[in-house]
Amino acid sequence: MGKVLIAMSGGVDSSVAAYLLKLSGWDCVGATMTLYRNEDIGISRSRTCCSLEDVEDARSVAFRLRIPYYVFNFSDEFRRQVMDRFADAYGQGRTPNPCIDCNRYLKFRHLYDRAVLLGCDAIATGHYARIEQENGRYLLKKALDASKDQSYVLYMLTQEQLAHTQFPLGALHKAETRQLADSLGFFNARKPDSQDICFVPDGDYAAFIRRHTGKADTPGDFVDESGRILGCHRGIAHYTIGQRKGLGIPSNRPLYVKASDPKSNQVVLSGNDALFSQQLTGENFNWIAWEAPPRQFRCSAKIRYRQTEQPCEVTVEEGGSVQVLFDRPQRAITPGQAVVLYDGDTVLGGGTIL
């Protein structure tokens, strides 16, 4: 065992994780990251992730468990490494996953640095995933509760990070976590799970980007696959691949967003059939299962958080980019999202879809 810093959000998962670690003999320290103020993101009274109420919830659990507790202000880092990247990606016609950047830069970098300063040997979170050691490497594995598995948003973890990370909930089902919290008398046992992107709780990404960048939307043309103008769009940030709602284009067939081009400021619309493709290119890959991957191999790939993995063949190019050829065409492969590769319940690695 040793000393561990637990990332506590005020929710049931991180609270039970803290309890389990203390029960198993770890010297526990709790910490909550404050990432923004509601006023800074244009929200007046909405309860969001990392709100003051959540800080008090986490503090109450830490007090009940009799463990030290800290609050760390990472708002500058969050703005620079998560919010700015989110806004920039949408401006480039991509659809990012900010939870992955939050894990990469905040939880497993800045929070871990604080853990080291506090003399901790490891950090822990309430993620549903598992870490196992095999043949001298640390492997990231799916949680036993497939419906709550979060390995997709953890693909960026390095060997060094995996060696100093604990996921106490990886072998539990969510129902068991809530039952345990109930039995312990935790007041947050029935607290709802966080939903959507924490700093855009209303789901209006375009409005957030306007506030964050200070730039107004730039209207442009909707075009079909041949380039014929179909109408006017409100700004590229309003649209993502596969979207049908909110287009406002009269048509005798359903139309969907197929692509967006920030250079021409055009959004391409098509029928549903044109959204399917069998191949993608990924970049910035992090490999977990190997130091260096085979040049070609078969596995399964996931291209969005709640999707079931799909069988595919992978080719690793000389420069490090990755070609993924699916056995069957996939709908709405979206640039900016993560592609994560699996062998059964083991994460092989992952990267960003081009």
What kind of feature is each model-predicted range?
Residues A124-E132, G136-L354:
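AMP-forming adenylation/ATP pyrophosphatase catalytic core
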